């Protein structure tokens, strides 16, 4: 059996903010349910890999976008980390550092010919 993918087929990758961005001092990110759970019971996480041990997309996204280019991706789906964007949900104050980060990621994807697809909720809530 031979199958020909359509010319406009989306070849890409996907990532979850909480699983790939990591936690960094000074960026204004608040705590979310996964951060809290990992602090309380790291042994419940496979090989104790938690928010502090990610692929660090937050710091290395430009390298990742270059890899997408090299491997022929034309799209990338990521999620917004609400605990980074609105660190304290009781105030609703938006973290400008997070806005700048997500805008830059989207701009870089577009600049490299990648279609950004954003997911606004992926099983993570602020505390």
Locate the predicted segments by residue:
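Substrate-binding cleft and catalytic face of glycoside hydrolase catalytic domains
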Residues: 65-127
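N-terminal carbohydrate-binding accessory modules
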Residues: 1-73
């Amino acid at each position: 059996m031979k199958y020909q993918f359509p010319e406009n087929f989306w070849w890409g990758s996907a990532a979850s903010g909480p699983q790939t961005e990591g936690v960094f001092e000074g960026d204004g990110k608040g705590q979310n349910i996964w951060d809290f759970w990992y602090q309380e019971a790291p042994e419940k996480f496979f090989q104790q890999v938690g928010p502090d041990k990610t692929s660090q997309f937050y710091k290395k996204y430009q390298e990742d976008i270059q890899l997408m280019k090299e491997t022929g991706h034309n799209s990338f789906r990521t999620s917004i980390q609400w605990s980074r964007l609105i660190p304290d949900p009781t105030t609703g104050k938006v973290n400008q550092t997070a806005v700048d980060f997500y805008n830059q990621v989207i701009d870089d994807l577009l600049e490299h010919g990648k279609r950004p697809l954003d997911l606004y909720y992926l099983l993570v809530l602020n505390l």
